[in-house]
């Protein structure tokens, strides 16, 4: 598994856990990271960036998700799906070094692993809607 995929999976676990536990996300990283995993250091760094970015820009991210999710309030979304969407939205809006299609594809792959059967299509629909309104990166 690549370092960024590992980072996304770690970030998802931290964001999901943070929704249910008050406090900082950093201690959660220690619980979900296997230091022996290849790419662990780079994955940790990327996960940390994603989590901090989502937390810093959460209001703007949630506003964008709400605008693109027809008939779905954030409160009705599955927590795993919402955490994946928040991560991907941070990448789409604030990480110019990651192409839009990579962000969307990675979010779908993470959703296949951690979400429900319907999660990949749900996440793809919302991210495609948002990505179509954003300028190309590069």
Curated annotation (Swiss-Prot):
GO CC terms of this entry: cytosol
Database matches in Pfam families: NusB
GO molecular function, one term: RNA binding
Keywords assigned by UniProt, alphabetized: RNA-binding, Transcription, Transcription antitermination, Transcription regulation
GO annotation (BP), single: DNA-templated transcription termination
Ranges in a coiled coil: none
InterPro entries: NusB-like_sf, NusB_fam, NusB_RsmB_TIM44
CDD domains: Terminator_NusB
PANTHER family xrefs: ANTITERMINATION NUSB DOMAIN-CONTAINING PROTEIN, N UTILIZATION SUBSTANCE PROTEIN B-RELATED
Entry function: Involved in transcription antitermination. Required for transcription of ribosomal RNA (rRNA) genes. Binds specifically to the boxA antiterminator sequence of the ribosomal RNA (rrn) operons.
Protein family per UniProt: Belongs to the NusB family.
UniProt-recorded name of the protein: Transcription antitermination protein NusB
Gene from which the chain derives: nusB
